[in-house]
Regions:
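Bacterial N-terminal signal peptides that target proteins for export
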Residues: 1-10
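Formylglycine-dependent sulfatase
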Residues: 14, 19-313
Length: 313
């Protein structure tokens, strides 16, 4: 099965009717199950895309999506920030009606109740195989915080997803590792991860103490543990073999998304893909560095468009 049918948001909403207040029956004919991919990008404005009139940067792959589907010029979001906007999308609920839906630290517990009937649950009930790839920022693990050295549960697999390859929070927050199906990718058990958002742990340098080690200037509290020359929000130590390389994050997201698509090309699938771009820190791959002529923000817009192009292929 390799159906690609552009959909408007209105065609998805009925699946979420009732969301967390019950288990709606979903009945979809076999011949009406197109593959569905949600692409969630942070900090991307309407003026950043050429399909919306941007003239100094070209986004041909996103433009093709706009030409084939529905381009919105008047829309509303439940929130303008990471965690609550994702919570609203996946649950169909207003985030301000529940506690703990503010921007989550990187060691937060899973903030969506596994008893909640999510969008992923609805898709799963309709016969779709479901996957989540990329930025998550909805917490992982039990109340009390996440232990990144063991299998993490509950996680995305407990709220409707069959597969996950996740950035636990954001790229500007520790821990700077990927999690695949509850396990930190590439973790050496002899170098366990410790994460804290209240005080420094370990002896890794920080942006506030060692600014000479930075390749990007810290701002807005981004002056804690330094990873890859970038100071993050929060402190971590350990997990050296599992640390991501910022310049390669977009490539990893594109790879894992396309691998999921290839594995399930003969069955209906639902893929939720959260990109790292164009959120800070903006660290484009060398293929895109300096290419936009608009600084790193312009470069990562090009990188985002490339990522979407890879998925569309």
């Amino acid at each position: 099965m390799n159906k690609r049918i552009p959909l408007s948001a209105a065609s998805i909403v009925p699946l979420l009717a009732g969301s967390c207040v019950g288990d709606p029956a979903v009945s979809v004919p076999e011949n009406a199950r197109p593959n569905i991919i949600f692409i969630f990008s942070d900090d991307l404005g309407i003026g950043d895309l050429s399909c919306y009139g941007a003239t100094r940067v070209a986004t041909p792959h996103i433009d093709r999506l706009a030409a084939q589907g529905q381009r919105f010029t008047n829309a509303y979001a439940t929130s303008a920030t990471s965690t609550p906007s994702r919570f609203g999308l996946l649950t169909g609920m207003y985030p301000w009606r529940l506690p703990n839906t503010q921007i989550a630290p990187g060691n937060s517990e899973l903030i969506i109740d596994p008893e909640c009937h999510t969008l992923a649950d609805a898709m799963h009930d309709a016969g779709y195989v479901t996957g989540a790839v990329g930025k998550w920022h909805l917490g992982l693990g039990p109340v009390g915080g996440t232990d990144f050295n063991v299998e993490i549960r509950p996680d995305a697999r407990d709220i409707g997803f069959d597969y996950e390859y996740l950035i636990p929070a954001t790229v500007d927050r520790v821990p700077c590792v990927f999690v695949e199906n509850g396990r930190v990718v590439g973790l050496d058990p002899s170098d366990p991860i410790t994460v804290n958002y209240d005080h420094k742990v370990g002896d890794w340098p920080t942006g506030s103490e060692n600014p000479e080690l930075l390749k990007l200037r810290p701002s807005h509290g981004h002056d804690n543990t330094i990873v890859n020359g970038i100071s993050r929000i929060g402190w971590m130590t350990g997990g050296r073999s599992a640390l991501w390389v910022d310049e390669g994050i977009a490539d990893t997201i594109a790879l894992k998304a396309t691998q999921f698509i290839a594995r399930h090309k003969d069955e209906p699938f639902f893929l939720y893909m959260g990109t790292n771009d164009v959120h800070v820190p903006r660290v484009p791959h060398p293929r895109f560095a300096g290419k936009s002529g608009l600084g790193t923000r312009g470069d990562v817009i090009l990188q985002l468009d490339w990522t979407i192009g890879e998925v569309m292929r």
